[in-house]
Amino acid sequence: LFGGLLDKLKEKIKKYCNKENLDKACSKL
């Protein structure tokens, strides 16, 4: 259950990073 929440959070972060083009901050993910 907790792992599923982490996956959803990562997906949100990836989408935000793609939209904002924050390559340096998002390359860590």
Swiss-Prot record:
Tissue expr: Expressed by the venom gland.
Cellular compartments annotated: Secreted
Superkingdom per UniProt: Eukaryota
Keywords noted in UniProt: Disulfide bond, Secreted
GO cellular component: extracellular region
Subunit structure: Heterodimer composed of subunit SS1 and subunit LS1 (U1-PSDTX-Pt1b), and heterodimer composed of subunit SS1 and LS2 (U1-PSDTX-Pt1a); disulfide-linked.
Role according to the record: This heterodimer may have anti-inflammatory properties, since the myrmexin complex (composed of 6 SS-LS heterodimers) inhibits carrageenin-induced edema in a dose-dependent manner (after subcutaneous injection into rats).
Note: There are 6 heterodimeric myrmexins which consist of a small subunit (SS1 or SS2 or SS3) disulfide-linked to a larger, quite structurally unrelated subunit (LS1 or LS2).
Family the entry assigns: Belongs to the myrmexin family.
Name under which the protein is recorded: U1-pseudomyrmecitoxin-Pt1 subunit SS1
